[in-house]
């Protein structure tokens, strides 16, 4: 049974290999590759700048301090309620 199933799979794989690359799968030109790498490098640089700017903005804002204070206050309230009920 295994041989019966594996033979058609092998034949299809061989046909695909022997057919060769399709028109869309042709070898890329060197110019396209270098321009693609340049675009990728530019994208990486832009992304890096945006991420740095975001983290700097978060560091400079007072959101982390406010969040920390809110959690501390909420924790204190919960502790007080647990003491009263105990």
UniProtKB/Swiss-Prot annotation:
Role according to the record: Inhibitor of lipoprotein binding to the low density lipoprotein (LDL) receptor, LDL receptor-related protein, and very low density lipoprotein (VLDL) receptor. Associates with high density lipoproteins (HDL) and the triacylglycerol-rich lipoproteins in the plasma and makes up about 10% of the protein of the VLDL and 2% of that of HDL. Appears to interfere directly with fatty acid uptake and is also the major plasma inhibitor of cholesteryl ester transfer protein (CETP). Binds free fatty acids and reduces their intracellular esterification.
Chief localisation class: secreted
Subcellular location(s) of the protein: Secreted
Signal peptide region: 1-26
UniProt-listed InterPro entries: ApoC-1_sf (IPR043081), ApoC-I (IPR006781)
MF terms (GO), sorted A to Z: fatty acid binding; phospholipase inhibitor activity
GO CC terms in record: high-density lipoprotein particle; very-low-density lipoprotein particle
UniProt KW ATP-binding keyword: no
Name recorded for this polypeptide: Apolipoprotein C-I
Pfam families found in the cross-reference section: ApoC-I
Miscellaneous comment as given in the Swiss-Prot or TrEMBL entry: Apolipoprotein C-I is present in acidic (APOC1A) and basic (APOC1B) forms in P.paniscus, P.abelii and P.troglodytes and perhaps also in baboons and macaques. The two genes for ApoC-I arose through a duplication process that occurred after the divergence of New World monkeys from the human lineage. In human, the acidic form has become a pseudogene sometime between the divergence of bonobos and chimpanzees from the human lineage and the appearance of the Denisovans. Pseudogenization resulted when the codon for the penultimate amino acid in the signal sequence was changed to a stop codon.
Organism, as annotated: Aotus nancymaae (Ma's night monkey)
Presence of keyword Transport: yes
Protein family membership: Belongs to the apolipoprotein C1 family.
UniProt entry keywords in alphabetical sequence: Lipid transport, Secreted, Signal, Transport, VLDL
GO biological process: lipid transport; lipoprotein metabolic process; negative regulation of cholesterol transport; negative regulation of lipid catabolic process; negative regulation of very-low-density lipoprotein particle clearance; triglyceride metabolic process; very-low-density lipoprotein particle clearance
């Amino acid at each position: 049974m295994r041989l019966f199933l594996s033979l058609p799979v092998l034949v299809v794989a061989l046909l695909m290999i022997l057919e060769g690359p399709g028109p869309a799968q042709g070898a890329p030109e060197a110019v396209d590759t270098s321009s693609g790498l340049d675009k990728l490098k530019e994208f990486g640089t832009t992304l890096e700048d945006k991420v740095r700017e975001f983290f700097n903005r978060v560091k400079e804002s007072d959101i982390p301090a406010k969040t920390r204070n809110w959690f501390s206050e909420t924790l204190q309230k919960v502790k007080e309620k647990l003491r009263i009920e105990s």
